[in-house]
Every structure is written in structure tokens, then in C-alpha cells.
Amino acid sequence: MKALGNISHVSNKGRIIARSDRTQQLGAPVFTSDGKRIGKVHDIFGPTRNPYISIKPSRAINPEKFENRVGETLYVGIKNVKKWGRRKRRRK
């Protein structure tokens, strides 16, 4: 796992906003320091050098609990990359 960034705040829509030093792949899973999965990367916005990353929490996670964890480091896992392009037909 690679370090994603630090929690900045929780948005009005329940997204966890983190400040990062690099962009991440959309849909990549996000973990806490103890390895618990909290959600996935939903959106990236802001300046290119230090973007903000919006994290959509999993249904089991209450985003209000992260309001008191501001400054905690989050980590990103490796997402399986889907292959783009045309699929070949199977012969019967």
C-alpha cells in the first residue's frame, strides 16, 4: 500500500476529503493505517501538484466518525486495471 495523504475534512455530502501530493487512480480502494478499508477514490480536484481527493466511504463506514480524525494518514491499494478494447467473440 502507498500513502495517499492526510484527512482534511468531511464534506456536507459525507465524502472524506484528503490532501495528497500526487494523483491517484479513480476507484482505487482506500485504507486506514491499521489496514481497514474505508472506501474508494471518488474524485480528484484542485491544483495539480497538491490535489484534493474525495473518498466515497463504504456503506458500513460512518463518515462523521472521521471528523475527529483530521490529519490521519490514509493509504491507497492497487486497483485491478480493466482491459479496454473490443472483446473477441467466442466460437460455438
UniProtKB/Swiss-Prot annotation:
Signal peptide as annotated in the record: none
Protein name: Uncharacterized protein MTH_886
Top-level division of the source organism's lineage: Archaea
Listed GO biological process terms: pseudouridine synthesis; ribosome biogenesis
Organism: Methanothermobacter thermautotrophicus (strain ATCC 29096 / DSM 1053 / JCM 10044 / NBRC 100330 / Delta H)
InterPro entries associated with the record: Gar1/Naf1_Cbf5-bd_sf (IPR038664), H/ACA_rnp_Gar1/Naf1 (IPR007504), Transl_B-barrel_sf (IPR009000)
TM ranges: none
Lineage start: Archaea, Methanobacteriati, Methanobacteriota, Methanomada group, Methanobacteria
UniProt record similarity statement: To M.jannaschii MJ0782.1.
Gene3D superfamilies according to UniProt: Probable tRNA pseudouridine synthase domain
Pfam families the UniProt entry points to: Gar1
